[in-house]
């Protein structure tokens, strides 16, 4: 395991849909297996091939509500009739073991983490331009026009929140953005 100045540090990465969060996090985890990527809890049913504790922690609605009520989530939200959240206990356990912990979450979740875990280092991932973000979203060719317009409207709002974050990384080039993330997270190369 590589030594890292990020040991025991919680880092939050957020940014609008289509900015490349997933690609950057995947690359970062391949380069730095010492990073622990937080596993979300959800009330939705497990999909075929999903493993409890690997992909998600699958909870019924009552158990999820108990977890939230007890302060056991760093952040949570409801989406499409299901609840999703970041359980506090596994994050704190990994931090106590000295591992750098990474949360890849949406803007509202990042705001909740800012309140519940203020020492977390928060990074906003931004596109080089709004036009490039739109090109990426349309390039996926998976959504109808109405969904694309919703994503773009939400992205405009999210981009206005950049100043709330400890750092902003512009994802114009994947390799350069990964190097910037490594530096911000204090990861040895």
Swiss-Prot record:
**CDD domains, A to Z:** GMPK (cd00071)
Residues holding ATP: 15-22
Q: Which GO terms describe its molecular function?
A: ATP binding; guanylate kinase activity
Task: Give the matching InterPro entries.
Answer: GK/Ca_channel_bsu, Guanylate_kin-like_dom, Guanylate_kinase, Guanylate_kinase_CS, P-loop_NTPase
Q: Which UniProt keywords apply?
A: ATP-binding, Cytoplasm, Kinase, Nucleotide-binding, Transferase
How would you classify this enzyme at the top EC level?
A: transferase
Looking at the keywords, is Kinase present? yes
Q: Which reaction does it catalyse?
A: GMP + ATP = GDP + ADP
Is Transferase included in the keywords of this UniProt record? yes
A Pfam family per the record? Guanylate_kin
UniProt EC number = 2.7.4.8
Q: Where in the cell is it found?
A: Cytoplasm
Q: Which PROSITE patterns match?
A: GUANYLATE_KINASE_1, GUANYLATE_KINASE_2
Q: Which GO terms describe its cellular component?
A: cytosol
Q: Where is the Guanylate kinase-like domain?
A: 8-186
Protein purpose: Essential for recycling GMP and indirectly, cGMP.
Q: Which family does it belong to?
A: Belongs to the guanylate kinase family.
The name this protein carries in UniProt is Guanylate kinase
Q: What is the lineage of its organism?
A: Bacteria, Bacillati, Cyanobacteriota, Cyanophyceae, Synechococcales
């Amino acid at each position: 395991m590589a030594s890292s100045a990020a040991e025991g540090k919680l880092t939050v990465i957020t940014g609008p849909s289509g900015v490349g969060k997933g690609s950057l996090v995947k690359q970062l985890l391949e380069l730095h297996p010492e990073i622990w990527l937080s596993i979300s809890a959800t009330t939705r049913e497990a999909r075929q091939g999903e493993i409890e504790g690997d992909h998600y922690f699958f909870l019924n609605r009552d158990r999820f509500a108990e977890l939230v009520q007890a302060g056991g989530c760093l952040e949570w939200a409801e989406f499409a009739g299901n609840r999703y959240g970041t359980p506090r206990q596994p994050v704190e356990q990994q931090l106590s073991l000295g591992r750098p912990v990474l949360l890849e979450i949406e803007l509202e979740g990042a705001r909740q983490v800012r309140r519940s875990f203020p020492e977390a280092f928060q990074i906003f991932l931004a596109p080089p331009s709004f036009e490039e973000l739109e090109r990426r979203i349309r390039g996926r060719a998976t959504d109808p026009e109405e969904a694309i317009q919703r994503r773009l409207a939400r992205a405009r709002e999210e981009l206005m929140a950049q100043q709330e974050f400890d750092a902003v990384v512009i994802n114009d080039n994947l390799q350069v953005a990964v190097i910037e993330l490594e530096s911000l997270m204090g990861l040895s190369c």
